[in-house]
Curated annotation (Swiss-Prot):
Disulfide pattern: C44-C59, C51-C68, C58-C86, C70-C84
Name used for this protein in its record: U1-lycotoxin-Ls1s
Compartments, as annotated in UniProt: Secreted
Range of residues in the leader sequence: 1-20
Keywords tagged on the record: Disulfide bond, Knottin, Secreted, Signal, Toxin
Keyword Secreted: yes
The organism of origin for this protein: Lycosa singoriensis (Wolf spider)
Organism superkingdom: Eukaryota
Tissue-specific expression: Expressed by the venom gland.
């Protein structure tokens, strides 16, 4: 009977040790993921800055993520180039205006 108790105690100890290592690995993975998210948050392109070379990296605004808006620019030589900047699309501006107005009315 004593041998069975010793074996059971040993198994419980091994299982708890291996599960705690698994949890530590999980926490390390979560930490790395959070650090990667923070780094991408730092690398986003602010409002009114150029996003011609990286159109999907605009930062978030108050309610929505800014969109890369492009226009065609004609230089003095007659050459056409595309220039893009991060900005708020008109329908997002309208939604922000309605939400702001609602906050003023309803507090």
């Amino acid at each position: 009977m004593m041998k069975v108790l010793v074996v059971v105690a040993l198994l419980v100890t091994l299982i708890s040790y291996s599960s705690s290592e698994g949890i530590d690995d999980l926490e390390a993975d979560e930490l790395l993921s959070l650090m990667a998210n923070e780094q991408t948050r730092k690398e986003c392109i602010p409002k009114h800055h150029e996003c011609t070379s990286n159109k999907h990296s605009c930062c978030r605004g108050n309610f929505f993520k800014y969109k890369c808006q492009c226009t065609t620019v004609v230089t003095q030589d007659g050459e056409q180039t595309e220039r893009c900047f991060c900005g708020t699309p008109p329908h997002h501006k309208a939604a922000e205006l309605v939400v702001g107005f609602g906050k003023k009315i309803f507090g």
